[in-house]
Regions:
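N-terminal amphipathic/basic-hydrophobic helices that include classical n-h-c signal peptides
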Residues: 1-17
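Non-heme di-metal
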Residues: 17-296
Length: 296
């Protein structure tokens, strides 16, 4: 377990004070989820919402590797031992997220013959292009934006547990584990950026670009999967998906205040302190990991 403190004792440097605001341990958990036989439309039987979640999962493996790459580019420049420990924990967690979502994506391919291979190749090429086109500071700003996006979505899942709990078995456990760990490390990339670049306009530009790419890629993949399943004309599920986004749980509408707060000068992710939401979830994850070890 890697533990990180709350504030550095150096009160003379505003930048150093900003570095270590993560107020809880960042724990690397190797879960090894056993993906069960899934219904084709595993999210409440809704094709549109299921393929939205499938599209999210498809972006994760190479997305997580891109985030690791962007943060690792700056690792040698960080001298603060607490932030260096956070970086190592961040890398460990993100690597495990990529591995588990790769297994989940492969299960979708094997069980339902979903055409994810081309989409995974597209993600790899798109992020390879980003590494070539964007400078390392732009890559880090983009990562900070994506990390905030995933953190506020994770916060919604933790606050409104029915988002995931109505999904049965290991699928629910995997997404909740991901939400817990995205919360634990939500400030790491931000603090690396603050310690090395600290450029407000670069930060907000990175968030705007991350938003554009997130919506474009996710919606493109969802559309493709719906077309493959001949579900584009399923208006009942389309309306159910609209309710999912806009009403209950309000996957998009309820994150708007936290999303907009990112654009405020002086913002820090832990100004949205949601430690209380993960304490019980952490106990559940530790119990699950212990059961998995005993069963092995």
């Amino acid at each position: 377990m890697l533990s990180v403190g709350s504030l550095l004792p150096d009160i003379h440097s505003a930048r150093l004070i900003m570095i270590s605001k993560t107020p809880l341990p960042i724990t690397v958990r190797r879960m090894d989820f056993d993906i069960p036989e899934l219904p084709r439309y595993w999210y409440k039987g809704n094709a549109w919402t299921t393929h939205f979640m499938n599209a999210l999962s498809t972006t994760f493996p190479d997305g997580e590797r891109f985030f690791i790459h962007a943060v690792r580019n700056y690792e040698k420049e960080i001298t603060d031992p607490e932030l260096r420990a956070q970086i190592r924990a961040f890398i460990g967690q993100e690597a495990n997220h990529g591995k588990e979502h790769e297994a989940f994506n492969q299960a979708l391919i094997d069980q339902h013959k979903l055409p994810l291979e081309k989409k995974l190749i597209f993600m790899k090429k798109a992020l390879g292009f980003a590494k070539k086109k964007y400078s390392r500071r732009e890559q880090l700003a983009l990562t900070v934006g994506f990390e905030h996006f995933t953190a506020i979505l994770a916060n919604l899942m933790l606050k409104q547990t029915d988002v995931i709990e109505e999904v049965q078995g290991m699928t629910a456990d995997m997404f909740m584990w991901h939400a817990v760990e995205e919360t634990e490390h939500k400030a790491v990339a931000f603090d690396v950026f603050t310690a090395t670049e600290d450029d407000y306009w670069l930060r907000v530009r990175g968030m705007a670009q991350a938003t554009f790419f997130f919506l474009l890629i996710t919606m493109r993949m969802q559309y493709s999967l719906l077309r493959h399943d001949n579900q584009l004309g399923n208006w009942r599920d389309a309306l159910g998906f609209a309710k999912f986004l806009l009403v209950k749980p309000g996957m998009f509408t309820r994150i708007i205040p936290e999303y907009l707060d990112f654009y405020r000068p002086g913002f820090h992710p832990w100004q949205h302190d949601n430690r209380h939401l993960i304490s019980e979830r952490v106990k559940e994850l530790e119990s699950y990991a212990l059961r998995a070890v005993n069963a092995a």
